[in-house]
Amino acid sequence: TLFRSIDCLGIAKEFNEALYKAFIGAGINLPKHKQMIMTICDSEKDEALPVAKRFAALGYTIYATWGTAKFLNDNGVEAIRVNKVEQESPTLLDLILGHKIDLVIDIPANGIERSHDGFIIRRHAIETGVNVLTSIDTANALLTSLESAGEQHTTPIDIATI
């Protein structure tokens, strides 16, 4: 198996500003439509709930597969149910290809795909310029950056002086 990693550095005096700069440098460019897709395996749903609540508090519309949408709705987070790739329209893929989505959070069970849906969703999202996260930790870091983005005034830092 070949793994690829892209590292990005944000330099600032404050953590939130450095994090914000790192996400911008990595090409994470949010928000446009404030619409996102969440597909979360059962074992990660409890950990993903606070993430969904924070995105909802930022004004994001959350689309989710049936199981994830039911879990979120049952726990006080409004989520719109959308069909999986192989089901009838509207599907998650329809939303991605329709350029309506800014972010996909796709968390498979222990990194294992039970179907090809996750791969198809991630591939098409990346090909159409949609940001994709596959880790709750990264989603939390992005949220920290987004929540403080309104107060961000990025300050240039001369790295030669560090």
Which residue ranges define each predicted feature?
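Surface-exposed amphipathic alpha-helices with a cationic face
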Residues: 51-57, 73, 122, 126
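Long, charged amphipathic helices and adjacent flexible linkers at domain junctions
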Residues: 15-43
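Short, small-residue-biased leader/transition segments that mark boundaries at the very start
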Residues: 1-2
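Mobile "lid/hinge" segments at catalytic clefts and subdomain interfaces of large enzymes
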Residues: 5-6
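Peripheral docking tails and interdomain loops at the edges
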Residues: 83-84, 92-162
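Short internal beta-strands
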Residues: 59-71
